[in-house]
Swiss-Prot record:
Function field: Involved in translation and accumulation of chloroplast ATP synthase subunits.
Taxon lineage: Eukaryota, Viridiplantae, Streptophyta, Embryophyta, Tracheophyta
PANTHER family assigned to the protein according to its UniProt record, in alphabetical order: OS03G0856100 PROTEIN, PENTATRICOPEPTIDE REPEAT-CONTAINING PROTEIN ATP4 HOMOLOG, CHLOROPLASTIC
GO BP: chloroplast organization; chloroplast RNA processing; positive regulation of translation
Region (Disordered): 17-58
Transit peptide, start-end: 1-73
GO MF: mRNA binding; rRNA primary transcript binding
Name of the protein: Pentatricopeptide repeat-containing protein ATP4 homolog, chloroplastic
One matching Pfam family: PPR_1
Family: Belongs to the PPR family. P subfamily.
């Protein structure tokens, strides 16, 4: 141990280093101690609280102690970091030429840089891709490099960050020409670069090169290439790689699980996506927010909002903090499934959190509100859109279309016209969807002249009517009084001559049923599947409203023959049933008429009825009306004095016994069974 005299005679300058003591004294007095200073004068051990000192705190440190070495290293490390940051900034600021890059790096490194210095500069600089490659070459010539592949990997990573696939390929070729052997990190970087550049085929190609260079994929590589195979449409190979990774006992991590969930979702295998999510939890892997968002998106696409709610509750219970992507997934799921209350709750949370909501999300909400009759909620959303300062949130033509649809379905003519005027003032032209909704609105309100005026607007704008527009005109015709029906039929004629011919045969009381049967068969046989049932429903509604039951039955026969209505009647040993769910009122009454005639014919032929007969109307109600098919049918059955009564334990069913049905049928003539 050194003597006190040797310490006092130490020839070097005393070191004064400022630091926070590990156990500071509770005394507020400051200390400045140096062996070169004279002893301090005596002072009061308990100075007045009013006295204060701004003197900095210094403590002398023995230069031979470990603490001095640590402080010196910290000071040196701080200087090195600053020097490397300056070098990265200088590289970013210089031109992408060999001479400017060399000059900037030579100024930053008077002495040959280390390999770690080169890695830090290449990894942190924001230079152009060409400058990064030139800097790589300078470091390879001038730095103390032990493994050249490390610097190539860092440069490839920089090119990946800038999504420069062609530069990455060129650097790979340069690397091979120089005889540098790529490693796993090289392939992982190149594969993820291809994926980031939207080139999944290239990612797959590079993955398949790995065995040629003696490289085996690690978990990061598996994750990148599984996603690449999925994006390339080869879900089978992606999942086979996932199984291979598990077979090789790789530890599952959230990255690869999120990737596999996404692959399952993209291929439509939503059960598989959910299984991977449950499997990772069973393996002890805690899902992160990316995994939660991915599985929420998958379940939203699968139209499983109840699963979305469960996963969201789990996310919150795990104290994960939802982000904007989470709320977007929830909105997608709830609006697609028409879960109105849940969707509005998510929307209001996003508003409270002041999250950006673009016009796409707004339009999804408005479309949902229009479908389920959320008038006040839609008006709130539309006001928020117009009040937004962000141009990406302003209403577009789809926003106005949803609002017109909403008001049209509720019969709010003034509201629909007001939105149309706002739309025109905002610089948007009405499209076929808006005019379809507007015509439906005028039809509900009985304003036939406005229907004709709106149809003229369609012609003035040069819009070609589509089959949905024609279906809307059919709906309007079914509810139009006979004295104004010709105006609507004129619009139908100009929209579709074939449909107009069928309607004219239908409304002409003198025309026989057989020509109508043939014309309707040609029309419905060539129509798109999505509009065939609406056409049938509307045509039968029109026939029933015009008291043309024979023609309504002919239309039903055509629909059954073409398979438009299926399984309308079912028979078992214990029950014969009529299934009317999904039919319009006119189509349902027509089907009931035919069924009653069939029952009467069975009795006349001496057949035995089963113990139970039932009519299934479903229990749903029209979104914009308190009346559903069940309500209408209950009233109609009472008018007929039919013995069918609503089943207390089977919602939407009207049942009767064979005894009651037989008695009723025998007291009625077949032609009198249905009073329309």
């Amino acid at each position: 141990m050194a003597s006190p005299s040797s310490l006092l005679s130490w020839p070097h300058r005393a070191i004064s280093l400022s630091f926070q003591p590990k156990n500071p004294s509770p005394s507020p007095a400051t200390a400045r101690v140096s062996v070169q200073d004279p002893p301090p004068p005596p002072s009061d051990a308990n100075p007045s609280p009013g006295r204060s000192s701004n003197t900095s705190r210094y403590v002398w440190v023995n230069p031979n102690s470990p603490r001095a070495a640590g402080l010196a290293r910290a000071r040196a490390g701080s200087g090195r970091r600053a020097r490397l940051a300056a070098a990265a900034a200088a590289l970013a600021a210089c031109e992408a030429g060999e001479a400017p890059v060399a000059a900037a790096l030579e100024a930053a490194f008077p002495e040959p840089p280390s390999e770690q210095d080169a890695v830090i500069v290449l990894n942190t600089t924001s230079a152009r891709p060409a400058a990064v490659v030139l800097a790589l070459w300078w470091f390879l010539r001038n730095a103390e490099v032990r493994k050249e592949v490390i610097l190539y990997n860092v440069a490839l990573k920089a090119l990946r960050k800038r999504r420069r696939w062609s530069d990455a390929e060129a650097l790979w070729e340069e690397m091979l020409r120089e005889g540098v052997q790529p490693d796993n990190a090289t392939f992982s970087t190149v594969i993820s670069c291809a994926r980031a550049c939207g080139m999944p085929g290239k990612a797959v190609e590079w993955f398949e090169k790995m065995p040629d260079f003696g490289c085996s994929p690690d978990m990061l590589t598996y994750s990148a290439v599984i996603d690449a195979y999925g994006r390339a449409g080869d879900a089978e190979t992606a999942l086979r790689l996932y199984d291979r990774a598990r077979a090789e006992k790789w530890q599952l991590d959230p990255v690869i699980c999120a990737t596999v969930i996404r692959v399952h979702s993209s291929s439509g295998n939503f059960d598989g996506a959910l299984n991977v999510f449950e499997e990772m939890k069973a393996a002890g892997v805690k899902p992160n927010l990316v995994v939660y968002n991915t599985v929420l998106d998958a379940m939203g696409r699968a139209m499983r909002p109840w699963v979305v709610k469960t996963i969201h509750r789990e996310l919150v219970s795990q104290e994960a903090v939802p982000n904007k992507a989470t709320y977007c997934c929830l909105l997608h799921a709830y609006t697609r499934a028409r879960y109105g209350e849940d969707a509005m709750a998510v929307y209001r949370v996003m508003k409270d959190e002041v999250m950006d909501i673009d016009v796409v999300l707004y339009n999804m909400l408005l479309s949902m509100c229009a479908d389920i009759g959320y008038v006040e909620e839609a008006e709130e959303i539309f006001r928020d859109m117009k009040a937004s300062m962000d141009s990406r949130s302003k209403p577009d033509s789809w926003s106005y279309s949803s609002m017109v649809t909403l008001y049209s379905c509720t019969g709010n003519v003034a509201g629909a016209e007001g939105i149309l005027n706002e739309m025109v003032e905002a610089g948007f032209k009405p499209n076929i969807f808006i005019l379809t909704s507007l015509i439906r609105c005028y039809g509900k309100a009985g304003r036939t002249d406005d229907v004709v005026r709106s149809f003229a607007m369609l012609e003035d704008l040069g819009i070609t009517p589509d089959d949905r527009f024609c279906g809307c005109l059919l709906t309007v015709a079914a509810g139009t009084p006979a004295d104004e029906l010709g105006k609507v039929i004129g619009c139908i004629d100009r929209s579709s001559a074939q449909l107009g011919a069928v309607v004219r045969l239908l409304v002409d009381a003198a025309a026989p049923s057989e020509p109508l049967r043939e014309a309707a068969g040609e029309l419905l046989g060539g129509a798109r599947g999505v509009v065939r049932m609406p056409y049938c429903n509307c045509l039968m509604d029109l026939a029933v409203n015009l008291s043309q039951m024979e023609k309504a039955c002919a239309l039903l026969d055509v629909a059954l023959r073409l398979g438009i209505y299926s399984n309308v009647q079912t028979r078992t040993q214990t029950q014969w049933s009529l299934h009317l769910r999904g039919l319009s009122v006119g189509a349902a009454l027509t089907t009931l008429h035919v069924w009653m005639s069939d029952l009467y014919a069975a009795l006349q032929a001496g057949d035995e009825l089963p113990p139970l007969l039932g009519i299934h109307t479903g229990q749903g109600k029209n979104t914009y009306s308190y009346k559903g098919l069940a309500t209408v049918f209950e009233s109609h059955l009472k008018e007929l004095d039919a013995p069918f009564h609503e089943a207390p334990d089977k919602a939407g069913w009207f049942l009767t016994t064979s005894v009651a049905a037989r008695h009723w049928l025998e007291t009625k003539k077949s032609a009198e069974l249905v009073a329309v």
